[in-house]
Amino acid sequence: MKKHLIIFFFILTHNLLLAQKSNCSANDLIERLEYTKAIELLTQCIDVTSKNTEGMLQLANCYYYTSKTEEAEKYYKLAYEAIKDKATHFNYIDCLRSNKKYDEANAAMKKFALKYSSDSRSTTFLKKDNATEALLNQQKKYTVKKININSDRSDFGGFLLDSTFYFVSSRIEQNKKYGWNEEPYLDIFFSIRKNDTVFSQPIPLKELNSSFHEGPISITKNGKNIYFASESFTVNQFDKIKNKKLKSGQVQLFTATNDHGVWIYAKPLPFNSKLYSVSNPSVNSTNTTLYFSSNMPGGIGGNDIWKVTINGDGTYGKPENLGPKINTEGDESFPFIDENNLLYFASNGRPGLGGLDVYKIDLKN
């Protein structure tokens, strides 16, 4: 899952006349987040000999958003001098890191830091310009093993409650395909853990799954409440873009109650919005604080880690940003809070090895 990046789309315009027709169609596909189909169109008129640097960058971004970092790097390099914006510049650096070209990534990051000196990623890099070497040479603390229920599709977002293991997967081939990567829509599954690597055959969590994306999830320690991500379309909350014949929705958070092993009364959380996404929930062991990722106003970067108080009467406080100790001008996501108040999260805004790296911080300090 290292290469399954969670990033907002970026669209380049002002294409050259030769690619005007194809690029116009590609723009429509990109606006619908259908990057795989956009690549098919763009590669018909863009190649390594092309003079259309803006089209090259558009193709590079499509490859980047679909985790094809080697292809993305090739086109970023060819059109490097034409990069005008910070996001695309950092995408290129991230590709180099993901492709293990750390010296090139550091050289590109130095140029980024000179151009965008106030960016938190620049200041952190200049303070820790040997961070990559330190990461590569650090002693391994964990042993990673594959378990027997992985598929050839995306499987992630694992959550273990007693012996029941919940996770998110796009393995149901009958589901409609998501245009971003042409994989089936995500569903929530559960499996019974038999030992460290052997789990029972996964079963879809039908009472929460819909025809849209579901997951990841988090469950309270007593097993009574579940928090899960889904799409705003499930509650008919979206904007219509009539001239494009599009419907624009968001990822939102929902909660449900366990009634004799069945999840019932699913309802949206009150801080959901049509204007921003809220996802990746993690509830603490006392069921008093919910952590999540969001691009809501008031943040520092793209996606930030936030928290909200869960009151005793079931209401919620006002979401609070966790601030610059955790969040950067990049993306922070997938928070997980453990019983000792250690927060684990993923970030691409710090010196790392490419894509989303895992970090932890003790929230007691």
Model-derived segments and spans:
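Bacterial Sec-dependent N-terminal signal peptides
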Residues: 1-26
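Start-of-helix register in tetratricopeptide repeats
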Residues: 20, 54, 87-88
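Alpha-helical segment of the N-proximal tetratricopeptide repeat
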Residues: 20-44, 48-49
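Short coil turns that delineate tetratricopeptide repeat
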Residues: 50, 83-84, 117
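Short, conserved micro-motifs composed of acidic
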Residues: 91, 98, 102, 111-365
